[in-house]
Protein backbone atom coordinates (compact mmCIF):
# COMPACT_ATOMS: atom_id res chain seq x y z
CA UNK A 1 0.00 0.00 0.00
CA UNK A 2 2.82 2.38 0.97
CA UNK A 3 4.78 1.47 -2.17
CA UNK A 4 1.74 2.13 -4.35
CA UNK A 5 1.23 5.50 -2.68
CA UNK A 6 4.88 6.46 -3.15
CA UNK A 7 4.91 5.40 -6.81
CA UNK A 8 1.76 7.43 -7.43
CA UNK A 9 3.29 10.49 -5.78
CA UNK A 10 6.51 10.23 -7.79
CA UNK A 11 4.57 9.75 -11.01
CA UNK A 12 2.64 12.94 -10.29
CA UNK A 13 5.76 15.03 -9.76
CA UNK A 14 6.26 17.82 -12.32
CA UNK A 15 8.91 20.50 -12.79
CA UNK A 16 7.10 23.82 -13.19
CA UNK A 17 3.50 24.35 -14.22
CA UNK A 18 2.60 23.15 -17.70
CA UNK A 19 0.21 24.67 -20.21
CA UNK A 20 -1.59 21.63 -21.60
CA UNK A 21 -3.16 21.28 -25.04
CA UNK A 22 -5.59 18.40 -25.42
CA UNK A 23 -5.78 16.88 -28.92
CA UNK A 24 -8.05 13.84 -28.77
CA UNK A 25 -6.55 11.50 -26.21
CA UNK A 26 -3.13 13.14 -26.47
CA UNK A 27 -2.07 15.82 -23.99
CA UNK A 28 0.74 18.09 -25.16
CA UNK A 29 2.91 20.58 -23.32
CA UNK A 30 1.68 23.71 -25.07
CA UNK A 31 4.36 25.99 -23.62
CA UNK A 32 7.05 24.06 -25.50
CA UNK A 33 5.33 24.68 -28.82
CA UNK A 34 4.70 28.35 -28.06
CA UNK A 35 8.26 29.16 -27.03
CA UNK A 36 9.71 27.03 -29.85
CA UNK A 37 7.63 28.89 -32.45
CA UNK A 38 8.63 32.26 -31.00
CA UNK A 39 12.34 31.40 -30.93
CA UNK A 40 12.37 29.71 -34.35
CA UNK A 41 10.48 32.66 -35.83
CA UNK A 42 13.07 35.03 -34.37
CA UNK A 43 15.86 32.86 -35.77
CA UNK A 44 14.30 32.86 -39.26
CA UNK A 45 13.96 36.66 -39.16
CA UNK A 46 17.59 36.94 -38.06
CA UNK A 47 18.78 34.68 -40.91
CA UNK A 48 16.58 36.47 -43.45
CA UNK A 49 18.02 39.85 -42.47
CA UNK A 50 21.56 38.48 -42.61
CA UNK A 51 21.14 36.98 -46.09
CA UNK A 52 18.95 39.69 -47.64
CA UNK A 53 21.82 41.54 -49.34
CA UNK A 54 24.80 39.22 -49.73
CA UNK A 55 28.12 41.00 -50.28
CA UNK A 56 31.60 39.77 -51.20
CA UNK A 57 32.95 41.67 -48.21
CA UNK A 58 30.60 40.47 -45.44
CA UNK A 59 29.63 42.83 -42.63
CA UNK A 60 27.30 42.75 -39.67
CA UNK A 61 24.79 39.89 -39.63
CA UNK A 62 26.14 38.36 -42.83
CA UNK A 63 29.59 38.18 -41.25
CA UNK A 64 28.17 36.47 -38.16
CA UNK A 65 26.17 33.98 -40.25
CA UNK A 66 29.22 33.12 -42.35
CA UNK A 67 31.21 32.60 -39.16
CA UNK A 68 28.53 30.20 -37.90
CA UNK A 69 28.49 28.40 -41.25
CA UNK A 70 32.28 27.95 -41.20
CA UNK A 71 32.18 26.81 -37.60
CA UNK A 72 29.49 24.18 -38.25
CA UNK A 73 31.32 23.02 -41.39
CA UNK A 74 34.59 22.57 -39.47
CA UNK A 75 32.75 20.78 -36.66
CA UNK A 76 31.05 18.37 -39.06
CA UNK A 77 34.25 17.75 -41.03
CA UNK A 78 36.28 17.05 -37.90
CA UNK A 79 33.78 14.70 -36.26
CA UNK A 80 32.19 12.97 -39.28
CA UNK A 81 35.04 12.91 -41.76
CA UNK A 82 35.80 14.36 -45.17
CA UNK A 83 33.82 11.77 -47.11
CA UNK A 84 30.23 12.43 -45.96
CA UNK A 85 30.32 15.49 -43.70
CA UNK A 86 28.58 17.68 -46.30
CA UNK A 87 25.51 15.42 -46.21
CA UNK A 88 25.15 15.99 -42.47
CA UNK A 89 25.98 19.69 -42.21
CA UNK A 90 22.31 20.82 -42.43
CA UNK A 91 21.31 18.39 -39.69
CA UNK A 92 24.17 19.30 -37.35
CA UNK A 93 23.66 23.00 -38.05
CA UNK A 94 19.93 22.80 -37.36
CA UNK A 95 20.52 20.92 -34.11
CA UNK A 96 23.13 23.42 -32.96
CA UNK A 97 21.06 26.49 -33.82
CA UNK A 98 17.84 25.14 -32.28
CA UNK A 99 19.53 24.12 -29.03
CA UNK A 100 21.56 27.35 -28.93
CA UNK A 101 18.56 29.62 -29.51
CA UNK A 102 16.41 27.63 -27.07
CA UNK A 103 19.09 27.78 -24.38
CA UNK A 104 19.77 31.47 -24.85
CA UNK A 105 16.06 32.19 -24.95
CA UNK A 106 15.76 30.58 -21.55
CA UNK A 107 18.71 32.57 -20.18
CA UNK A 108 17.73 35.97 -21.62
CA UNK A 109 13.94 36.01 -21.63
CA UNK A 110 12.10 35.97 -18.27
CA UNK A 111 9.47 33.52 -19.53
CA UNK A 112 8.08 32.85 -16.08
CA UNK A 113 7.10 36.50 -15.68
CA UNK A 114 4.68 36.18 -18.62
CA UNK A 115 1.31 35.35 -17.12
CA UNK A 116 -0.85 32.67 -18.74
CA UNK A 117 -4.35 31.44 -17.83
CA UNK A 118 -2.67 28.22 -16.72
CA UNK A 119 0.91 27.00 -16.63
CA UNK A 120 4.05 28.99 -17.35
CA UNK A 121 6.44 29.49 -20.24
CA UNK A 122 10.06 28.34 -20.30
CA UNK A 123 12.91 27.40 -22.59
CA UNK A 124 12.03 24.43 -24.84
CA UNK A 125 15.21 22.65 -23.72
CA UNK A 126 14.13 23.01 -20.07
CA UNK A 127 11.41 20.43 -20.85
CA UNK A 128 12.55 16.81 -20.72
CA UNK A 129 10.22 15.89 -23.59
CA UNK A 130 12.12 18.22 -25.93
CA UNK A 131 15.57 16.97 -24.99
CA UNK A 132 14.52 13.31 -25.22
CA UNK A 133 13.01 13.95 -28.66
CA UNK A 134 16.24 15.60 -29.82
CA UNK A 135 18.34 12.76 -28.40
CA UNK A 136 16.18 10.10 -30.09
CA UNK A 137 16.48 12.03 -33.35
CA UNK A 138 20.26 11.86 -33.00
CA UNK A 139 20.06 8.11 -32.35
CA UNK A 140 17.91 7.53 -35.44
CA UNK A 141 20.31 9.66 -37.46
CA UNK A 142 23.44 7.70 -36.62
CA UNK A 143 21.63 4.41 -37.25
CA UNK A 144 20.56 5.77 -40.64
CA UNK A 145 24.08 7.05 -41.35
CA UNK A 146 25.63 3.68 -40.61
CA UNK A 147 23.09 1.64 -42.57
CA UNK A 148 23.02 3.99 -45.58
CA UNK A 149 26.82 4.03 -45.86
CA UNK A 150 27.64 0.42 -44.98
CA UNK A 151 24.45 -1.56 -45.38
CA UNK A 152 24.30 -4.62 -43.18
CA UNK A 153 28.04 -4.33 -42.56
CA UNK A 154 27.17 -1.61 -40.09
CA UNK A 155 26.29 -4.26 -37.50
CA UNK A 156 29.93 -5.43 -37.53
CA UNK A 157 30.48 -2.43 -35.26
CA UNK A 158 28.73 -4.31 -32.46
CA UNK A 159 31.27 -7.15 -32.48
CA UNK A 160 34.36 -5.03 -33.17
CA UNK A 161 37.06 -5.68 -32.08
CA UNK A 162 35.68 -8.80 -30.33
CA UNK A 163 32.19 -10.39 -29.98
CA UNK A 164 32.49 -9.91 -26.21
CA UNK A 165 31.68 -6.24 -26.84
CA UNK A 166 28.18 -7.02 -28.18
CA UNK A 167 26.18 -6.47 -24.93
CA UNK A 168 28.18 -3.34 -24.12
CA UNK A 169 27.61 -1.86 -27.58
CA UNK A 170 23.87 -2.58 -27.32
CA UNK A 171 23.78 -0.96 -23.87
CA UNK A 172 25.62 2.03 -25.33
CA UNK A 173 22.75 2.60 -27.78
CA UNK A 174 20.48 3.21 -24.78
CA UNK A 175 22.92 5.28 -22.72
CA UNK A 176 23.77 7.69 -25.54
CA UNK A 177 20.28 9.26 -25.84
CA UNK A 178 19.85 9.18 -22.06
CA UNK A 179 23.09 11.07 -21.43
CA UNK A 180 22.38 13.55 -24.25
CA UNK A 181 18.87 14.34 -23.06
CA UNK A 182 19.44 14.51 -19.30
CA UNK A 183 22.67 16.52 -19.57
CA UNK A 184 20.99 19.21 -21.65
CA UNK A 185 17.75 19.18 -19.64
CA UNK A 186 19.48 19.32 -16.26
CA UNK A 187 21.81 22.18 -17.12
CA UNK A 188 19.18 24.40 -18.72
CA UNK A 189 16.54 23.74 -16.09
CA UNK A 190 19.00 24.42 -13.27
CA UNK A 191 20.02 27.71 -14.88
CA UNK A 192 16.38 28.79 -15.28
CA UNK A 193 15.55 27.91 -11.68
CA UNK A 194 18.58 29.72 -10.25
CA UNK A 195 17.86 32.88 -12.25
CA UNK A 196 14.16 32.69 -11.36
CA UNK A 197 14.87 32.40 -7.63
CA UNK A 198 17.39 35.27 -7.70
CA UNK A 199 15.05 37.51 -9.68
CA UNK A 200 12.37 36.84 -7.06
CA UNK A 201 14.67 37.44 -4.07
CA UNK A 202 16.98 40.20 -5.39
CA UNK A 203 15.35 41.56 -8.54
CA UNK A 204 17.82 44.31 -9.50
CA UNK A 205 21.56 43.54 -9.53
CA UNK A 206 22.44 40.04 -8.36
CA UNK A 207 20.79 38.02 -11.18
CA UNK A 208 22.81 39.80 -13.92
CA UNK A 209 26.16 37.95 -13.36
CA UNK A 210 24.25 34.68 -13.08
CA UNK A 211 22.50 35.44 -16.38
CA UNK A 212 25.85 36.00 -18.09
CA UNK A 213 27.09 32.71 -16.65
CA UNK A 214 23.89 31.12 -17.94
CA UNK A 215 24.56 32.47 -21.44
CA UNK A 216 28.03 30.93 -21.37
CA UNK A 217 26.88 27.53 -20.13
CA UNK A 218 23.95 27.57 -22.57
CA UNK A 219 26.31 28.09 -25.51
CA UNK A 220 28.61 25.34 -24.22
CA UNK A 221 25.69 22.91 -23.89
CA UNK A 222 24.60 23.61 -27.48
CA UNK A 223 28.17 23.01 -28.65
CA UNK A 224 28.44 19.76 -26.66
CA UNK A 225 25.13 18.48 -28.00
CA UNK A 226 26.01 19.21 -31.64
CA UNK A 227 29.56 17.86 -31.24
CA UNK A 228 28.37 14.59 -29.71
CA UNK A 229 25.70 14.21 -32.41
CA UNK A 230 28.35 14.67 -35.11
CA UNK A 231 30.72 12.31 -33.30
CA UNK A 232 28.11 9.54 -33.08
CA UNK A 233 27.36 9.91 -36.80
CA UNK A 234 31.08 9.85 -37.59
CA UNK A 235 31.47 6.74 -35.46
CA UNK A 236 28.64 5.06 -37.39
CA UNK A 237 30.15 5.75 -40.84
CA UNK A 238 33.74 5.02 -39.82
CA UNK A 239 35.30 1.97 -41.45
CA UNK A 240 36.66 -0.56 -38.96
CA UNK A 241 39.74 -2.51 -39.92
From Swiss-Prot:
Q: Which Gene3D superfamilies match?
A: ATP synthase, F0 complex, subunit A
SUPFAM superfamilies annotated for this entry? F1F0 ATP synthase subunit A
Q: Kindly list the cysteine pairs connected by disulfide bridges.
A: none
Q: Which UniProt keywords apply?
A: ATP synthesis, CF(0), Hydrogen ion transport, Ion transport, Membrane, Thylakoid, Transmembrane, Transmembrane helix, Transport
Q: Where are the transmembrane segments?
A: 30-50, 91-111, 128-148, 193-213, 214-234
**GO terms, molecular function:** proton-transporting ATP synthase activity, rotational mechanism
Task: List locations, semicolon-separated.
Answer: Cellular thylakoid membrane
- List the InterPro entries: ATP_syn_F0_a_bact/chloroplast, ATP_synth_F0_asu, ATP_synth_F0_asu_AS, F0_ATP_A_sf
Q: What is its main location?
A: membrane
Q: How does it sit in the membrane?
A: Multi-pass membrane protein
Q: Per its UniProt entry, which superkingdom is the organism in?
A: Bacteria
Gene Ontology cellular component terms for the protein in this record: plasma membrane-derived thylakoid membrane; proton-transporting ATP synthase complex
Quaternary structure, from the entry: F-type ATPases have 2 components, CF(1) - the catalytic core - and CF(0) - the membrane proton channel. CF(1) has five subunits: alpha(3), beta(3), gamma(1), delta(1), epsilon(1). CF(0) has four main subunits: a, b, b' and c.
**Family indicated by similarity:** Belongs to the ATPase A chain family.
Question: So what does this one do?
Answer: Key component of the proton channel; it plays a direct role in the translocation of protons across the membrane.
Q: Protein name, please? A: ATP synthase subunit a
Q: Which organism is it from?
A: Prochlorococcus marinus (strain MIT 9515)
The encoding gene is atpB
Amino acid sequence: MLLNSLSTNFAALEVGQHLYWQIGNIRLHGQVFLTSWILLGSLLVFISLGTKKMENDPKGLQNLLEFLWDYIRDLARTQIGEKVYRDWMPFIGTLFLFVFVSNWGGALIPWRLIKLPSGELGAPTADINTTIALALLVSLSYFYAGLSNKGWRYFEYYVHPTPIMLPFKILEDFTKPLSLSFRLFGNILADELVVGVLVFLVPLVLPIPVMFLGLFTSAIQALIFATLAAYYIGEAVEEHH
